[in-house]
Each structure stands twice: as C-alpha cells, then as structure tokens.
Amino acid sequence: MAQIVIVPAIVTTASVLPFAAELASQLERNDAIELDLAAVTDADVSFLQLVCAARRQAEHDGKTLRLAHPVHAELTALLERAGFLTDIPSADQTFWFHGDLPR
C-alpha cells in the first residue's frame, strides 16, 4: 500500500525546501508514495522540477511515485506554461493525467 503524502497549498521557490525534505524522507522510508495535490493552490516550476526529480529517483531505486488524482486545472496550466505538455511522452501523460490530456 502506498504512503499518501499531502502536498502543501503553496509550493514555490520560496517554500519548496521543507516539502522537498519531507518527500525525500518519505521516499527513503517507503517503497510506494502517492502524492495528493488537491490542496495545491500556488505552485511554480520548482514544484514541477522537484516532482520530476523525485519520480526519477524513485524509479532508479525501484520504488513508485504516483499522483493520487490527475492534476487539476491550475497545475495543468502550470505544466503548459513550463513547456511540459509540448510533445509529452506517454509515460508523463499517464503520470500527470492518468491517461488522456485534458481538453
């Protein structure tokens, strides 16, 4: 069973360090992590970079990092602005959206 990690409402460059430490700690202690992004109201590219790095590290370590639910509209807009949706690989599409891109 995956350990659920509630992502804080604000995850920006100014506030990402405590969440990064928590995520690293959870990945060290658990084989499967599920991120709950429902509370996120303010995020920037540092959040996306952290999640991508954690996902790669989890894969490298034979662990699983996934999202509890597909990203909501605000995070979809952030992914778009940051260029993550341009020619998105299917594995990334599955990770962020659990399948099809939103329209």
Region spans (language model):
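STAS-like cytosolic regulatory interaction modules
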Residues: 1-43, 52-103
